[in-house]
Amino acid sequence: MFKVGSWLYGKKPGTASTQSLDSLTELRDSATLILNDDVDGAEDGLSEGISSFHNLGRGVVAFIRATLGFEQEIMRQASERLNIAETSAASDQHKAQHNSHAPNTYHSQIYVPGTEFALCQAMAQLMSAVVGVLNESLTESIKGFYKMRKAYITLDGILKMEQKFMQMKRSGELSPPELAQSSSRSSGQGADAKSNPTTPVEAGGLSQKLSELNVSREPTDSDMSVETSSEMLSHDPDSDIFRNQIDVFVHSGANFCFGILLLLISMVPPAFSKLLGIIGFHGDKERGLKMLWQASKFHNLIGAIAAFAMLGYYNGFVRYCDIMPDPVSREEGDVQAYPQERLEALLAKMRKQFPKSQLWLLEESRMEGANKNLERALELLCGEERSPLKQVEALRVFERSLNAMYLHRYQLCSESFIECVDLNSWSRSLYYYIAGAAHVSLYRSALGKDASEATKHAEQATEYFRTAPPLAGKKRFMARQLPFDVFVARKIAKWEARAKEWKVPLVDAVGVDPIEEMIFFWNGHSRMTQAHLEESLQHLAWSESDANKHWSREGPEEKAILQLVRAAVLRSMRKHSEAKDLLQRGILDHDKSLFVGHLKDNWIGPAAHFEMAANLWMERPTYIEIHGGPDEENPGEDAHQLERNKVRQCKEYLEKAARWESYELDARIGLKVTAALEAVHKWETAHSATS
């Protein structure tokens, strides 16, 4: 196989650069093994190579392990490897640019010499940024944002090259060699271009101040670049454009990196989006998803990672959010709803490509759960086969724990979350808390029926609850405590205070079913069938039943939680009028100061506003036409006017939730609010012409 160095520098293979197509092939073949749960094979295949591609591959392997498990030691290893990859790629990019005019130098039709190394650099920077933001150090998080900015500049430069290529290809004015040279000149990457090995490729004067960067709806040059180069998104891997594996690597990599960047930034909650807005970053979900779909077409490491990212997004985030854009058609261009057939085909492709991986089995389970097949979702995760990759095994057990929780299989739920404690150190306080909550449900079921069984579960719940608080705060995100750690510590402190005040055991001071409350936070009700939802209502009803001797002592806060969670169940049952009535009478009619104060659940207000908005969104005639549901409230009212009224009211509630002062779990609820406001904006844009 010919050396890339001989193409770049006009040298014979024997004396060429260490960078080669062989190295790129080893990156593709070896690093991809981790997606088949073969981490040892991935490490061994990349261990001896010294090229930038090998360095990147080692960084990718560590990064995947780090982001699957969130363990600090693995994150440190990933950070070190990615720094090496970034430095190596910068050096090789500099060499490629310096020798770009050597005799017989190979020129891509699309990209300037050294672009493949610029992409390696950008990929390393993006992965470093993610690791930095996940790091417990605020300093490392800030460094992560800076690396994100540098990666953006590089990726924008690559997209400008694609834009130039498509423009000239369409005009037919230049032959491929001339086109490459023209692209090189227009991007400022000729032989005379000065390059610092520590900085990324700079195309078309893109070295802007951070505050000037804008990846949003404004008609900037960057937008024009992406819009024009989007013509390439219609080209499949077998297109003549992608005859060279280097071009395949650059195109798929640039689409994946820029796509994931746009998608992730578009998803951040209001508090973080303000920070990103200040430094000039704004996301674009639709554009990002289209670029990820394009990257997933390619049969390489990048294609597989893009597929994993999208399956996680659609089966996790989309199914977590209740207010999402309406599907516009069954065409491939519609990416913001839930393109089920495309996702099923993509998952089948990945299962075939990686038959030994529990990771893709996990994604199949998530897809089943997202489509209300919780029993099948749980069954897929209860097999005997185990992943040799600890991080994948931890994910499998965690997902099994959640599914058991949604299905009200309390013993399995508790056992599985306790198993998570040994597999992952990210949020052990939460694992113990949910395990204890499951025993609260078993305790309440046994009350009045089996005293010894009730005592056993009460003791187990108490043990787990008291184990949880000391573990809270051990892990941090951007130097802040994890949201659920804060929640768990406060919640148990609240119950301990009530137990002391009421002179009752801790298990009797617990309020509204904590499992149902946790299902609400994970949006598990949207994954349930009618039978499962009816079971949830029965468990919630216990609070007001004669079996609960302490309900009369409860104040408006705990009663508000009951009405909020009950309303969420009713919404999932498509009983919107009942749900809205509970929210209005139980929460919105009260002064919000009732839910603010020491040990109080101050998330109730914003969560109730989001729930009201979700009901209104689901009452729209368009939503009912697509998803089914109850008959219209006012059949005589004009459908278009009814739709507009529902959207207007929905937006009002969302804006109130978005403006809410800081509260517990604001990042988690904020994710849903951000996605919802984007869906409303998309609806308004689509309907502005008919207003």
From Swiss-Prot:
Q: Where is this region: Disordered?
A: 170-230
Q: Which InterPro entries match?
A: Iml2/TPR_39 (IPR019412)
One short Pfam name that applies is: Iml2-TPR_39
Question: Which Gene Ontology cellular component annotation is one that this UniProt entry carries?
Answer: cytosol
**Any idea which UniProt keywords this protein has?**
Cytoplasm, Nucleus, Phosphoprotein
Q: What does this protein do?
A: Inclusion body (IB) resident protein that interacts strongly with lipid droplet (LD) proteins. Involved in LD-mediated IB clearing after protein folding stress, probably by enabling access to the IBs of an LD-stored soluble sterol derivative that acts as a chaperone in inclusion clearing.
What name does this protein carry? Inclusion body clearance protein iml2
List the top taxonomic levels of the source: Eukaryota, Fungi, Dikarya, Ascomycota, Pezizomycotina
Which gene name does the record give?
iml2
